[in-house]
Design a protein with these regions (language model features):
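A short acidic, Gly/Pro-enriched loop at the edge of an enzyme's catalytic core
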Residues: 209-216
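A glycine-/small-residue-rich N-terminal strand-loop-strand element
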Residues: 50, 72-99
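NAD(P)H dinucleotide-binding glycine-rich loop of Rossmann-like/cofactor-binding domains
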Residues: 63, 86, 96-159
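Short, surface-exposed secondary-structure boundary micro-motifs
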Residues: 38-39, 80-82, 98-99, 160, ...
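Short N-terminal strand-loop motif that marks the start
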Residues: 1-69, 314
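C-terminal hydrophobic helical "lid"/dimerization subdomain
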Residues: 2, 270-315
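Glycine-rich phosphate-binding loop and adjacent beta-alpha segment
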Residues: 220-282, 315
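Mid-domain Rossmann-like dinucleotide-binding core that forms the NAD(H)/NADP(H) cofactor-binding site
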Residues: 130-201
Length: 315
């Protein structure tokens, strides 16, 4: 077999620009391993990039070279370049690959930098592994690298049932924080099972519910929510946003620590995520697993903002 299935686009646009192609399987190069993909997570940044927006789109020109979405990959090493990478053929691996440069994870085979991969934990379903890297790293970096969340602190996590949110709840609870999360009523039992006290964003004003009691807020739902969240922070509190960095100065002028996070690959953090997954302390909720041929449907589902956990593609 010399060719593989790959989902690509040759112009930015809506999900209709995604199409399947047969292309040559890449050959291993130094410092990389060739992975046979088992599962690839679908993330909001995939949709943003597909539209020609965001940092990843600035690094690609689909009219010159077809762009292949995706940065989450889980699979099996099938070839190396012969140099030492720490992996051998047959190893199961997963990771956030090359972000924000093009990684091409929506493909049957992915050529990935070895230093961004870790071995898969035993007895964790493949779909969970494929759905974990970007969202788990985002949650981990937001809470511990940027916000420096500590045991006993109180944290508000917006969109608690979403890809980042449901993992952030688990990580914060494991760290000994008191966790609150916004979610729609149908997701309250789910959010509660993860370790958070749910707040119905449709019928409740989280500012009135919480008062000025939060040490940390993780925002992934836009500028107005960011600004409203300042009302629940204690003096000197910390807020991390995953959306536009525009309102950061407003928060800083009021004495809060405010940072905008763009996730980055980190092998040591991935090893900790793998450890937690192996112990059953961090579980990726997979809403649906779809075939690569259903990539457009996967993007449409993520675009609704109403999926629980992750959408995952499988070849």
């Amino acid at each position: 077999m010399t060719t593989m299935r790959q989902i690509q686009l040759t112009e930015w646009g809506d999900e209709s620009v995604l199409h399947e192609a047969n292309v040559p399987i890449p050959s291993p190069v130094r410092g990389h391993v060739l992975i046979k993909t088992v599962a690839a997570g679908v993330n909001p940044i995939d949709l943003t990039t597909r539209k020609g927006l965001g940092p990843a789109a600035q690094l690609a020109d689909p009219s010159y070279k077809p762009f292949v979405p995706g940065w989450d990959v889980a699979g099996t090493v099938v070839a190396t370049a012969g140099d030492y990478t720490g992996f051998k053929v047959g190893d199961g691996v997963f990771g956030l690959v090359a972000f924000p440069s093009p990684a091409g994870a929506y493909a049957e085979y992915v050529l990935a930098p070895a230093h961004q991969l870790v071995k898969v934990p035993a007895d964790v379903p493949c779909a969970q592994l494929g759905g974990a890297p970007l969202t788990a790293l985002t949650a981990y970096q937001a809470l511990f690298e940027v916000a420096r969340l500590k045991e006993g602190e109180r944290v508000l996590i917006h969109s608690g049932a979403g890809g980042v949110g449901h993992l952030a709840i688990q990580l914060a609870a494991q760290a000994g924080a008191q966790v609150f999360a916004t979610a729609s009523a149908p997701n309250h039992e789910f959010v509660r099972s993860l370790g958070a006290q749910p707040i119905d964003y449709r019928t409740e004003d989280f500012r009135a519910v919480l008062g000025q009691t939060m040490d940390v807020v993780l925002n992934s739902t836009g500028q107005q929510t960011f600004l409203d969240s300042l009302e629940v922070l204690v003096p000197g509190g910390r807020i991390v946003t995953l959306t536009s960095p525009d309102p950061l100065d407003v928060a800083r002028e009021r004495g809060f620590e405010a940072q905008w996070l763009t996730v980055h690959p980190d092998r040591m953090q991935m090893q900790e995520i793998a450890r937690l997954m192996s112990l059953g302390l961090l579980k990726v909720h997979v809403d649906q697993v779809l075939d690569f041929s259903q990539a457009a449907q996967a993007h449409a589902l993520v675009a609704t903002g109403r999926t629980r956990g992750k959408i995952v593609l499988a070849p």
